[in-house]
A protein has these predicted regions:
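Conserved binding/recognition cores within well-folded domains
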Residues: 1-68, 72-75
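Eukaryotic intrinsically disordered, low-complexity regulatory linkers and tails enriched in Ser/Thr/Pro
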Residues: 38, 67, 71, 77-98
């Protein structure tokens, strides 16, 4: 069992889900939409039809991509505004806790 806190991002590849975690990568059969429904939307965001990222690990947001742990992930046009606003809100919340 994988802790959601350890998931950096999830990608779908050839009908498989690849969970990229702080402890390594795990591949299982499944649908990205089903996984997204189960994750906490305060922390997890869909960047495009193939990737879900954990905001805890995002280090940079650009117009058309996000960077987390050195990995560049494309952001589709339809998700750009949501990702920028949700990331800003996430960072504001994080700053309040400090």
């Amino acid at each position: 069992s994988i802790s959601t806190n350890d998931i950096t991002y999830v990608e779908v590849f050839d009908h498989n889900l690849v969970y990229h975690t702080t402890g390594g990568d795990y591949t299982v059969r499944g649908r990205l939409g089903d996984v997204y429904e189960q994750l906490d939307h305060d922390y997890f965001l869909a960047c495009n039809r193939s990737f879900i990222v954990n905001l805890r690990y995002v280090t940079e947001i650009c117009t058309d991509h996000v960077i987390l742990n050195g990995t560049k992930i494309s952001v589709s046009k339809s998700h750009r505004k949501e990702i920028q606003s949700r990331f800003s809100a996430f960072m504001d919340k994080r700053a309040e806790k400090v």
